[in-house]
Amino acid sequence: MFGACLLSSCSDQTLKLSSSDKSIEATFAWAQGMAQSYAHEGEDPVGPWYEAALPERYAFCMRDASHQSIGAEILGLSAQNFNMMQKFASNISESKDWCTYWEIDKWNNPCKADYVSDNDFWYNLNANFDVIDACWRLYEWTGDQRYLANEEFRRFYDLSCNEYVESWELKPEQMLTRSRKVNRKDGERFGLCRGIPSYVESVGDMNSSADFIGTAYGGFAAYSKILEQCDEMEGSALAAEKAEAYRQHLDKYWWSEEEQAYHTFWWNNGTFSDGEGLTHVLWFHAVNAPSRIRGTVEKMMKRKEWNIENISYFPALWYRYGYSREAYEILCNIVHAERKEYPEVSFGMIEGIVCGCMGIQPSASSGKIVTLPQIVGEHWIQIDNLPVYDGLISVRHDSNTCSSFTNKTGHKKTWQAAFYGDYEHITVDGKQHQALKRQDAMGKTISYVEVTVGKGQSFRCEAGC
């Protein structure tokens, strides 16, 4: 249907997405404009940053910034990402029980909405691990070695995975025995909000949560990969072991056979309950059994009331687990949602389209750039001048069986052209190659080839030919 599957070139270096699906094209254009309106180039005391908090606070908080970071890279906001993550890393301190500042404003101060003193401040305990995971993902996208070796980052990673865990009683075996009153100080304003063991903030007597456990898993898994890249193999193995302990705890104690999903909260009266905390269990890959992923997704989809913050995660999540039509519906309708101006929304839609629908996933640790289209309907989609590593790439998909790739970076790249389906062959510029096979998280077969693409070169791959 799509003939030669040609990748047309965009002559300048402006990021541009185009598609025969005008709904996706319109959503990307809206999200790109909205997200870029939140970006600041360095004119403020805090340095380069983008808004990642409630609008009009002129600030960025740990959860929002971590989630928005890949969308920001897609928009070319690398300087902002590094500066913001470094601000979080550099402000970790013993006086805050190894927390950092939850939210930092453009004047380079802890945001007054969340901070009075080191004894009296708001803090969600997931946050340290969320930032570690974000820094790993930023390294994978950019190849920036500073996320691995910078002294302030390494100090933050090490303290978060050791002293922080000890101080707040956050080991897996402590999840069902810890007190909500750990490290409670005499702060008059924030009280027990100095150390909320969840990203769900409306629950009072909660001692631990599934979303915290999922985030801790993600943080330790990322820490393990960071140490591996630094050739610290013993530390990497230990961190991976700790990550797996969180996963096993989640599976052993939090899974409900009756509900076929995870409980979300553990109360101080020794009981479980359910709520909106499952997003981060999936976001951080804390579940590896396809049946349990499916049960969790289905439970989430049955829930009718979600805040816009959670919804901003859903396109990337649903594409990851093969629910492409549900992801597509959100992308098409988000422009009509209430509170769509919340910064996470536009950044999340950008990631959902580029990393979800187009399946573009750079991996500096493996030296590869993966593409895996999940287009709904018979459409083409193309992105030009996408910032990756040390330069730009362009990618086009024609339906879900033909992809083209142009390398505009300064060095040759390995492109893994992947397609859903069990194909015997994939053609590369008309030459037939034996397809390699792997499975996704749900056990679905993916066929792929790996192509070395030199500087300035373009290649086209088509499945089933």
What is the meaning of each model-derived region?
Residues 5-59, 137, 145-166, 227-229, ...:
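Acidic/polar, glycine-enriched structural segments that form the non-catalytic walls/loops
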